[in-house]
UniProtKB/Swiss-Prot annotation:
Annotated organism of origin: Haemophilus influenzae (strain ATCC 51907 / DSM 11121 / KW20 / Rd)
Stored InterPro entries: Dup_hybrid_motif, PTS_EIIA_1_perm, PTS_EIIA_component
Alphabetized GO MF terms: kinase activity; metal ion binding
Self-association and partners: Heterodimer with glycerol kinase (glpk).
Gene Ontology biological process terms in this record: phosphoenolpyruvate-dependent sugar phosphotransferase system
Catalytic site: H88
Binding site residues for Zn(2+): H73, H88
Name of the encoding gene: crr
Protein known as: PTS system glucose-specific EIIA component
PTM sites of type Phosphohistidine: H88
Pfam families with a match to the protein in the record: PTS_EIIA_1 (PF00358)
Protein's job: The phosphoenolpyruvate-dependent sugar phosphotransferase system (sugar PTS), a major carbohydrate active transport system, catalyzes the phosphorylation of incoming sugar substrates concomitantly with their translocation across the cell membrane. The enzyme II complex composed of PtsG and Crr is involved in glucose transport.
Length: 166
């Protein structure tokens, strides 16, 4: 670290504020209320869930799609600021083997906030899934210094659900 870094701070020491937008329209639900311990006990990270309305899951940030599960019920992505996100539709939806889900985006694709990643049939999923609560979690929480969770009704791609400092 040089003299100017000590006086003015280096880029590496500056925190970055990141807003994570709703990936699905609906009502925010506490992550602790998701009926799956993997999410409610924050085993895979901290975040929020949404009780969905509508028929699409969108990119919650500008970034790159990582892995999209073969069954299209979940995906990971990384924001341009390096925040790693995991989006999962419903609980035990993997057991539906892709029924009710249509992949729109592809792994490795650069996306903008609001771009459609997956489309879904909500009526079918409500009738067949254990729950349609849709969690989004930060999987690299060790790099996050502060997380503020929003509440209320949200619109996909338009409403902030999490405000972070990285």
């Amino acid at each position: 670290m040089g003299l100017f870094d000590k006086l003015f701070g280096s880029k590496e020491n500056k925190s970055v504020e990141v807003e994570i937008y709703a990936r699905i329209s609906g009502e925010i639900v506490n992550i602790e209320d998701v009926p799956d311990v993997v999410f409610s006990e924050k085993i895979v990270g901290d975040g929020v869930a949404v009780r969905p309305i509508g028929n699409k899951i969108v990119a919650p940030v500008d970034g790159v799609i990582g892995k999209i599960f073969e069954t299209n019920h979940a995906f990971s992505m990384e924001s341009k600021e390096g925040v790693e996100l995991f989006v999962h539709f419903g609980i035990d939806t993997v057991e539906l083997k892709g029924e009710g889900f249509t992949r729109i985006a592809q792994e490795g694709q650069s996306v903008k906030r609001g771009d459609t990643v997956i489309e879904f049939d909500l009526a079918l999923l409500e009738s067949k899934a254990k729950s349609v609560l849709t969690p989004i979690v930060i999987s690299n929480m060790d790099e996050i210094s502060c997380i503020v969770k929003k509440s209320g009704e949200v619109v996909a791609g338009e409403s902030v659900v999490l405000a972070l400092k990285k």
